[in-house]
Each structure stands twice: as structure tokens, then as C-alpha cells.
Curated annotation (Swiss-Prot):
Pfam families: Ribosomal_L37ae (PF01780). Binds 1 zinc ion per subunit. Belongs to the eukaryotic ribosomal protein eL43 family. GO terms for molecular function: large ribosomal subunit rRNA binding; structural constituent of ribosome; zinc ion binding. GO terms for biological process: translation. A zinc finger (C4-type) spans 41-62. InterPro entries: Ribosomal_eL37/eL43, Ribosomal_eL43, Ribosomal_protein_eL43, Ribosomal_zn-bd. This is Large ribosomal subunit protein eL43. GO terms for cellular component: ribonucleoprotein complex; ribosome. Disulfide bonds: none annotated. Its cofactor is Zn(2+).
Length: 96
């Protein structure tokens, strides 16, 4: 009999079988889906940004490398900071 490394509902976390509990396996599945997904490159704009290793992302089209989050190129905190910086820059340009 052939063993499957994944299942329909749990995806790649099916490799753990019945171990570790359902919630943990679902969480692992969600993280792995996020990290394996192709993201939009901030330099060239193509959907070719892939994870090389922890927090290192590379565009397969233009070759640009960047540091980002461990599982996604931009973290939630990074988005908040970028938005705050954008607001400060916009307010300074309005004053001038």
C-alpha cells in the first residue's frame, strides 16, 4: 500500500499523520501555503518573488534580493511602519 505525504484537507501537513493535533497541522499548512506562494516583486512588478531562506526573498525575473518577513515578504508590522512613513512624507510635502 502506498502512503500519501499529504491529504486533501490538511495539504502538506499530512506528512505528520495523526501526530501533533489538528490545530497545529492546520497552522503549519497555512504557513507553508503563504511561504511557497509567489509574491509581486517591488522592483520589476512581476509575480516572481520567491523565498530563498528565512527572511530572504529573490525575484526570479530581475534578480533583486530583499529581506522581509520569515514567511511573507512584508510583515503586518512592516506595512504599518511603511504607511506611517508615507503619511509623514505626505504631510511634509503639503507644508512646503
Amino acid at each position: 500500500m502506498v502512503e500519501f505525504s499529504h491529504t486533501k484537507k490538511i495539504g502538506s501537513a499530512g506528512r505528520f499523520g495523526a501526530r501533533y493535533g489538528r490545530k497545529v497541522r492546520v497552522r503549519v499548512r497555512d504557513v507553508e501555503i503563504k511561504q511557497k506562494k509567489a509574491y509581486k516583486c517591488p522592483v520589476c512588478g512581476f509575480m516572481k518573488l520567491k523565498r530563498i531562506s528565512t527572511s530572504i526573498w529573490e525575484c526570479k525575473k530581475c534578480g533583486a534580493k530583499m529581506a522581509g518577513g520569515a514567511y511573507t515578504p512584508e510583515t503586518g508590522a512592516g506595512k504599518v511602519v511603511a504607511k506611517a512613513i508615507r503619511r509623514v512624507i505626505e504631510s511634509k510635502t503639503k507644508e512646503i
